[in-house]
Amino acid sequence: MPAPAFPAPLMLKSGIRARDAWPLDPDVIHLNHGSFGAVPTAVVEHQDALRRRADLSPVEWFPRIAERVRDARERTAPFLGAHAEDSVFVPNASA
């Protein structure tokens, strides 16, 4: 019996394989990214950068959290086809 033909790897706009965007063990086939799972490497790097900025000047960082959340809602809502005023961030949307 011939080996199964697998589809071409899913590619991101950046030109890298989608699988390579996560810091997952390449020897394991990961199927669950719904209720729990790894965070893409680019997201982890951005989170680290935000934590460093907060740690550099907490006195300036924390008073601006509401403004940063509002800005993030305004940027993400159009991507989701929603209005910013109808959008919220929650810790776990599946809970």
Predicted regions and their residues:
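Pyridoxal 5′-phosphate
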Residues: 1-95
